[in-house]
Amino acid sequence: MIFSAHRSIVVIVEGSLRSLALALVVAIALAGSAAAENGEFNRRATATAQILAGITPPAGDPALDRLVKLEAFAEHQKWMASHWGQARSRISAIESWRGQQVKISGANNKTLLYPFSGPDFLNAYAFFPDHPLYIFFSLERPGTLPDLESVTPAQFGKMLQDVRNAFRDIFERNYFITDYMSKQLTTPWIRGTVPVMATMMALMNLRIIRIEPIDLYPELTNSYEALEAKRPRRLMLGVRIDFSSANGGPLHQLYYFSVDAADKWLEFYPDFLDWVAQHRPASVLLKSASYLLHDSQFEKTRAMILSSADYVIQDDTGIPYRFLQQSPWRVRLYGRYHKPIKGLRYGYQADLESAYKAKSNLPELPFPFGYHWRGKRSGLLIANR
């Protein structure tokens, strides 16, 4: 993403409540796993996501059957088919490349950490489809799926237009633009990241088992909502989405949190980084992140990632190269290095540019990744230990 403001992370509970919170998360995961194994899924949520994706869901829900007969849906299907076709070819290239280049031991028992993610489920799932747990965090509110029960034809047409607006950049560029998202994800019909992530799940032929709000710090939330309380710039909001493949495969869980990850704002949620660190060793995805981890205001978040990760896929906007040059990290470079785009020149890394120049015949990157998405100008780095 391109950021105009600082990005984010998440939380849990204090002192003696920590173990209780962890037990609750484990219990929820076990319950969701049992539901997935029994072939259960939320038909309304899955069908709603399919409609937003331009996919006709199975008939049988009168509230939705009426909508897929409208001309607005036919137009939306045509647009999504065209634009998703382009994005799907990119995803296929990522999947093919991943099969050859990405080797993660024990992937089916690992967590993917995606800092500054926005609603970008597509890249997370394309690179790390075997991970059972995903932790996303960024500034955008989670929101909810739209309710299609009583939407009018006119409202439905506006909703689908909002979906197209929200997907335009990720389909074309393979990243979101923060300034645009502040408008795209706050319309009367598309609110927050949940509608976008759910739509992406439908496009990837996944089924939604449940979507539930999560508040890992209810006591803090209550105290910050009090009048005259000293509070963070943004209250942390969370959501958990359980999903599985269409054939009823293993359960996956996605935790998304909206919170500012700058050091001074994380002071309002002091245990969050410890909670994230409990998922070590984690895989990490960083892309189009406005070089936030180069900024001294994000030192705590950067330190947590470096101590918790054992496998990182990123572009040059992620962890500064100087940290990954050090033992015990091993680095592989792909594609090309280009200086940062206009407005982000402070992210230039002479050492990374030199590393690219020092290696001849670096493997090409067969898909766009990061801000240099036009042509074959993208670069990607894999670091593991």
Language model feature labels by segment:
Residues 1-17:
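N-terminal secretory signal peptides that target proteins for export/translocation
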Residues 134-185, 208-227:
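Thiol-based oxidoreductase modules, predominantly thioredoxin-like and allied folds used
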Residues 1-6, 26-29, 169, 190-198, ...:
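Composition-driven recognition of long, C-terminal low-complexity regions enriched in serine/threonine
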Residues 117-128, 135-137, 173-198:
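Short, thiol/selenol-centered motifs that function as redox-active sites or metal-ligating centers
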Residues 16-29:
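Bacterial N-terminal signal peptides
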Residues 202-273:
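Active-site/pore-lining binding-face segments in mid-to-C-terminal subdomains
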Residues 32-36:
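Sec/Tat signal peptide C-region and signal peptidase I cleavage site
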Residues 37-168, 251-385:
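Non-globular targeting/processing and membrane-anchoring segments
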